[in-house]
Amino acid sequence: MIGISRHTDYAMRIVLHLSALPESTQVTADEIARKRLLPRAFMRRIIVRLAEAKILRTVRGAGGGIMLARPASEISMFEVVVAMEREVTLNPCVDHPLFCPLSVSCPVNRAWEGVTKQLQTTLSGIRFDQLANAIEPKSAKAGYTGPPSAGAGRKSAKGGRRGRS
């Protein structure tokens, strides 16, 4: 199977949750876990990785929490995948030519290289502000209705903007 790890999927949900909130809003990991249906056991490790990648900022102590380190419009899906997976490649030969002695002359390797570049380009072009704006008012999954104040800036069911004045 070609895919991403569960940790990467969970990281996407964390960044999406924060992207749907007004800029600089700080929330707890427990709130995100509850609202995005994430197992709390994985949260700390994922948050640390995202903070190391300068995607999230953490505040310790009483009143602490997490927030985006920069605007959602400056964070791409590619960055989150790299933070969690360390590299985005579909075949080890693409990024590590010494892995296979045939990689230099292999047409399959060149095909994988092209597909990998397309994937990286596509993921780099998807920003979290775009994803946050695409959140439906109600998710079909488990009655999720979005984070508090998530309606700010999103379209209402009647098609107009709601929240920000």
Name each region found by the language model.
Residues 55-69:
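Beta-hairpin "wing" of winged helix-turn-helix
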Residues 96-165:
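C-terminal regulatory/oligomerization modules of transcriptional regulators
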Residues 27-37:
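A short alpha-helical element within helix-turn-helix/winged-helix DNA-binding domains
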Residues 1-15:
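Short alpha-helical segments that sit at the start of domains
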Residues 13-21, 83:
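Short amphipathic alpha-helical elements of helix-turn-helix/winged-helix folds
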Residues 34, 51-52:
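Alpha-helical residues within the helix-turn-helix
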Residues 72-99, 108-118:
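Conserved segment of winged-helix/HTH DNA-binding domains
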